[in-house]
Regions:
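Mature catalytic domains of secreted/periplasmic carbohydrate-active enzymes
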Residues: 1-162
Length: 162
């Protein structure tokens, strides 16, 4: 029998106790769409003009939460930051003339209110079969590297299956 022990980082995460997980992205603009939905979603409809991550996080903090996690990319493949790896992201939307960055606004707001910040990235993607394996690996590693080096996260959250 294997003796598995949690890492120091996993144990520290347990001490965080109470937090929020935000699932916000392109699909919020498509009523009735679900995970693994086969219908296309045009990035040009993404325009959260009233996005106020600071308001979300002030509410979380007031409720006693100590951390918040943002979904950076989910199964639809849309990146909530202006990734250099692919075009299906906030950089090709009307929101802030393609200069917006949901992940930056979220991570900055977490720090402003004194909350730990985590990022969720789904490695699974509904159009993944359109990539050859090496191309997808490069795309995946490139995006993960952007998130881990560009946003100073407290705990990166990544699952192999969702």
């Amino acid at each position: 029998m294997t003796n598995c022990k949690p890492s120091k980082q996993q144990l520290a995460f347990l001490d965080w106790e109470f937090g929020a997980f935000f699932h916000f992205g392109l699909r919020a603009f498509y009523k009735g769409y679900r995970d693994w939905d086969t219908r296309d979603m045009d990035a040009s409809v993404f325009n959260p003009e009233k996005l106020d991550c600071a308001s979300w996080l002030r509410t979380c903090k007031a409720a006693g939460m100590t951390y918040a996690i943002m979904t950076c990319k989910h199964l639809d493949g849309f990146a909530n930051w202006p990734t250099a790896y692919g075009d299906y992201s906030v950089k090709n939307t009307p929101w802030k003339n393609g200069k917006g960055d949901v992940v930056r606004e979220f991570t900055d707001a977490c720090r402003e209110v004194g909350m730990k910040v985590g990022l969720y990235y789904s490695p699974a993607q509904r159009d993944q079969s359109a990539f050859d394996k090496m191309d997808y690996d490069d795309y995946f590693i490139g995006q993960i590297t952007e998130l881990l080096t560009g946003y100073d996260v407290s705990f990166p959250e990544c699952h192999a299956s969702t």
